[in-house]
Amino acid sequence: MFRSALLIATLVSAASVNSANAERQIATLSASEAEAIIDGCQAFAETNDRIHGIAVYDSSAHLLAFLRMDGASVGAAAFALEKAKAVAMWRFATSGMEEAVQGTPGFGNAPGVVSVAGGVPVFSADGKDFLGAVATSGEPPLQDVECAEAGITAAGLSATRG
């Protein structure tokens, strides 16, 4: 009898949790927004005679869009993927991870940490919702950041929490 009551209580509890989760919407990038970020970043790079690998992940750290520009090395493209995934996982810029590694013993060994600038979080236009991440690689880190931010701006989104 006790086991039956416990099983029923567990099932009811699980059903109410699932119902609450179904009602909660998680903000994330759409495929069209990811493409707009890639297009904006590529346009910025071409205007400034730069070559990048560009990666965009959603808020759950799933790859949405990727481009290895003509002439970009395989290594640069792979590094863009790693930077963007790190930002999607940790929800802050890789430049911040660089600072955290220097100031927080052991943080550099945490899963997914990339301590080189170039990965940038993507927020909704009003800065309220974390939507995902974009990263570029192939140029000096600050130029990678500029390109990523240009892509975010071109998509009508924000690189900063507001």
Residue ranges and their predicted role:
Residues 1-6:
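Bacterial N-terminal signal peptides that target proteins for export
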Residues 12-20:
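C-terminal segment of classical bacterial N-terminal signal peptides
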Residues 21-162:
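Flexible, solvent-exposed loop/hinge segments and secondary-structure transition points
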